[in-house]
Regions:
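N-terminal, positively charged/glycine-rich alpha-helical extensions of SAM-dependent methyltransferases
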Residues: 1-17, 219
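Conserved alpha-helix/loop element of class I SAM-dependent methyltransferases that forms part
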Residues: 25-48, 55, 67-72, 89
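C-terminal alpha-helical "lid/dimerization" subdomain adjacent to the S-adenosyl-L-methionine
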Residues: 204-260, 266
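Class I SAM-dependent methyltransferase SAM/SAH-binding core
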Residues: 75-107, 119, 123-158
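A short glycine-rich, Lys/Arg-flanked "PGG" loop and its adjoining helix->strand segment in the class I
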Residues: 182-197
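A short acidic, Gly/Pro-enriched loop at the edge of an enzyme's catalytic core
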Residues: 157-169
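Core SAM-dependent methyltransferase catalytic element
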Residues: 261-287
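Hydrophobic beta-strand segment of the Class I
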Residues: 16, 169-170
Length: 287
């Protein structure tokens, strides 16, 4: 990514989360939560934690912590992860209970136990996340949150990881900032394991009249002003509005993702099309 954009994000890092929440009226928090909950359901359906598996309750057989033979580790990458909000939400949602009921997971280990159809226990383990971003200023904000994660400064189009390193990749409001979205999709496909998921939460180029009016008329009037007032960086929030208008529509993005090998599992529209959650799957049959 170009250095002026990196410099811009470094300059707003300390106020980034606050302004995201403020400018979206805290809707961005709900959007992330929805995405993580839906990923959990997808993972259950596709066999990472089967929906037809019963949960470990007080009446179910207990399993020693060191004797879970069928443990499935979830390797998480929060790409363009900034301050780590998406990864933090993912872990909180995962540790709050299984996909099919309200049974609690172990907050110390980040695990959930299930019973398979034959009665054997299996455990679902979330490993420490990797939070990757090109801005060292944004990554510096990860540590104060005490997130169980490793921060890595990287280029989303050329990541320092081997193939099939992750089971889940999150990308929240970062795809617009990559010079080559196709290149970022192909690279995400490369490092994602077969059967894994890429979730893209993004402001796509508006496609209906209301959203075109909002982003082309209303947003340029108040978003840069509010951004300047709270961060002193008006140019960063002018860039935000312009990057949305210049970006792909959600339909064009999904078409591009399919051309890169992904299956589009779901497109979720938030708040009338202000933002979208796109859930992409790398086929199990992928080499």
């Amino acid at each position: 990514m170009k250095s002026p954009v990196r410099h811009m994000f470094n300059g707003i890092a300390s106020r980034y989360d606050f302004l995201n929440h403020f400018l979206s009226c805290y809707q961005d928090v709900l959007w992330r939560r929805y995405c993580c909950k839906y990923l959990k359901k997808l993972m259950a359906v596709d066999g990472i934690a089967p929906e037809n598996a019963g949960c470990m309750t007080s009446n179910a057989p207990k399993v020693a912590d060191n004797a879970v033979e069928n443990a499935r580790k979830v390797r998480l990458l929060d790409l363009c992860g900034g301050t780590g909000d998406f990864a933090h939400t993912f872990r909180k949602i995962f540790e709050g209970g299984c996909a099919c009921c309200s049974a609690k997971m172990n907050p110390q280990k980040g695990t959930a136990q299930f019973l398979s159809q034959n009665g054997t226990a299996r455990e679902f383990v979330v490993e420490p996340a990797v939070i990757g971003d090109f801005s060292y200023g944004m990554l510096a904000e990860v540590k104060p949150k005490k997130i169980d994660a490793h921060a890595v400064q990287l280029d989303a189009m050329k990541m320092p990881f081997a193939e099939r390193q992750f089971d889940v990749i999150l990308n929240g409001f970062g795809m617009r900032n990559v010079p080559d979205a196709r290149g970022a999709l192909l690279e995400s496909y490369r490092v994602l394991d077969a059967g894994g998921y890429l979730c893209v939460l993004e402001f796509f180029s508006p496609r209906n009249l209301f959203n075109k009016f909002f982003y082309k008329v209303l947003a340029p009037l108040f978003i840069p002003v509010m951004g300047a007032f709270f961060s002193g960086k008006r140019d960063a929030y002018e860039y935000l509005v312009n990057s949305i208008i210049r970006f792909l529509s959600v339909d064009d993005f999904c078409k591009m993702a399919e051309e890169c090998g992904f299956e589009v599992k779901k497109v979720k529209m938030f708040d009338g099309g202000i933002s979208f959650g796109v859930f992409l799957h790398k086929p199990v049959s992928a080499a």
